[in-house]
C-alpha cells in the first residue's frame, strides 16, 4: 500500500513525569512504552494481511527527531522568550480518555517514563508497518498526576496548549520548509 507519505511528525500533548520537563516545554522522545489496550495495533492482523513482524527497537526516526530539534533551535533563536526543549525521553502511551492516577504515574516513573500521553500508539507502529518514518513533537501541558500540588484542570491544559501551539506551529513550518 503506497500512500505517497514518507514521513510523519506527530504532535502530542503530554503530562510531565521527568523533573526537567516543565509545562509549556517541548520534548522529542526517542523511546516509548505502550500501556494502551483494545486498540487496532496492526494492519497485519491475519484478517486483511498475513501477520508481519516489524523491528520496533527504535520507534522514532532519528533523522526526523534531529530535524525537529534543529527547528526548535531555529525558532528559539528568533524568539525573545524561547522554549525549553528536552532532546530525548521515554513516552508512556496510556489508554485514556481519563487522566492517570497518582499511583499509575509513580509506576510509569519507576518504568523509566519521562512523559505520559494518550496518543502516539498504535500510530508509531502502524507507520513503521507502512515504512513511513515517524517522530513525535510532544508539548508538555501539565505535571502528571500527583507530581504537583496544583490540581489538573482542562482549563489549565487548554491554556498551556493555546500558548504552546504557537511555538509548535512555528516549528512545524520550519520543518516543512526544510524538508
Q: At which residue positions do the language-model features occur?
A:
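Glycine-rich phosphate- or other oxyanion-binding loops that anchor nucleotides, phosphorylated ligands
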Residues: 1-143, 155-179
Amino acid at each position: 500500500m503506497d500512500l505517497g507519505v514518507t514521513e510523519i511528525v506527530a504532535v502530542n500533548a503530554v503530562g510531565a513525569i521527568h523533573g526537567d520537563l516543565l509545562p509549556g516545554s517541548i520534548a522529542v522522545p526517542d523511546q516509548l512504552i505502550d500501556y494502551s489496550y483494545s486498540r487496532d495495533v496492526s494492519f497485519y492482523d491475519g484478517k486483511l494481511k498475513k501477520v508481519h513482524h516489524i523491528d520496533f527497537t527504535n520507534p522514532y526516526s532519528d533523522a526526523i527527531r534531529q530535524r525537529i530539534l534543529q527547528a526548535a533551535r531555529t525558532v528559539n533563536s528568533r524568539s525573545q522568550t524561547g522554549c525549553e526543549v528536552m532532546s530525548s525521553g521515554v513516552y508512556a502511551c496510556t489508554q485514556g480518555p481519563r487522566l492517570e492516577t497518582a499511583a499509575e504515574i509513580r509506576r510509569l516513573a519507576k518504568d523509566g517514563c519521562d512523559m505520559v500521553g494518550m496518543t502516539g500508539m498504535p500510530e508509531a507502529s502502524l507507520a513503521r508497518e507502512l515504512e513511513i518514518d515517524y517522530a513525535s513533537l510532544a508539548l508538555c501541558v501539565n505535571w502528571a498526576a500527583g507530581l504537583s500540588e496544583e490540581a489538573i484542570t482542562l482549563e489549565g491544559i487548554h491554556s498551556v496548549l493555546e500558548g504552546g501551539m504557537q511555538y509548535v506551529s512555528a516549528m512545524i513550518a520550519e520543518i516543512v520548509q526544510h524538508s
